[in-house]
Amino acid sequence: MSEQYTTPERENPDDERAFDRVFDALSISCPCDNPSNIPNRLFASPPTQSAPEQIDNGAADVQPFDFQAYNQPRLARTEGMLKLEIPNFSNLRSKVSTPFQYIGNLPWRLAAKTEKTKRTSDVKFFSVYIDCNPESESTLWSCDAVVEFRLVSRNRTIPPFSRQFTNKFNYNSNNWGFPSFMAWEDVNNSNYVRNEMVTVTARVVVQKVLGVRNVPKYDFGAMQTNICDMTLVINKQKLFVNKAYLALYSPVFYAMFFSNFQEREKTQVELEDVVLEEFRELLHVIYPCHKPITSDNVEYLLELGDKYEIQYVMDECERFLVGSEDILQITKLMWADQYLLAKLQDSCLRNIKEVSDVKAIKLTEEFKNLSDATKAALLEKVLKIVN
């Protein structure tokens, strides 16, 4: 097979030429090609305060941290697999693709179609492509990655057909693949088609990403010597944490780890009346990854945030509930009541526009569990609407 058919290309090469013409006309280069250009600061640093009296505490012998070396682009090798199953393959006419899947903190999508154009010598081919962050309008990111496409074989005597390429994906090069991946007549047979279904996979190995930050990930089930100094035991399962970090968020943990409680001298503490996976979710919310609050976890995070007096968790839950349309108003009012969430209660009351809205709340089973203060607030809202 000629080199023409084995070299990866953009799905729409005209897009790249148009982009280059615009950049050439403006006499600028893509910022992601030279990430080391550091702009001047817009604002001055805070005024220098008077120097404190120098105290010799041995710090003079400490070597400064080499930020320049640390800030060199670091490799963040991440792998992922995308799988595209194409039904009714013999009648494939238009482009089909997978949902987006995040690999290396960037969205990737595998796509396939047929092509019979000048670049395929007017021969019908099965084409496959990979999209990386195609919906972003930013020109500040780039991603070095290796992509391997595989056409799954249905015949045990025939290995999968594969092709691989390496590319720097960026705004100007976010779609790449093989327009001549395999001749149509070579694909459309029993070696690769079963029950009118063809399966294509793409293995993506991300080697380096610029302009997009990786979200920190933590495995609380693994002991990390430098940052873990406390073991929490829940239902005989161990979670390894940093007690000072937890104490910053929770006065309950501060008292447990640093006051005159018997746990102070321990390196392992058992927590009772806690569900392991729910507490693990709590840790993911308060650790630097700051996992978002969702409809699935908000209820038990409110319980745990209240139990351990973690104001950050309570605030995040309240912020989520104020903006959520998936949680019923009566449920929001009940939680606002239970955990004294004034902003949430205020939001619920402001969303009541008609007397019928209050009547609907009153007809619910949960209404009887509301406090007298909340019932009075609902009555006052009715009076405001009527008057």
From Swiss-Prot:
InterPro entries the record matches: BTB/POZ_dom, MATH/TRAF_dom, SKP1/BTB/POZ_sf, TRAF-like
Pfam families xrefs: BTB (PF00651), MATH (PF00917)
Domain of life: Eukaryota
Domain MATH: 79-204
Residues annotated as domain BTB: 228-295
PROSITE patterns: BTB, MATH
PANTHER family documented for this protein: BTB AND MATH DOMAIN-CONTAINING PROTEIN 36-RELATED
UniProt-recorded name of the protein: BTB and MATH domain-containing protein 38
Organism lineage string: Eukaryota, Metazoa, Ecdysozoa, Nematoda, Chromadorea
Gene: bath-38
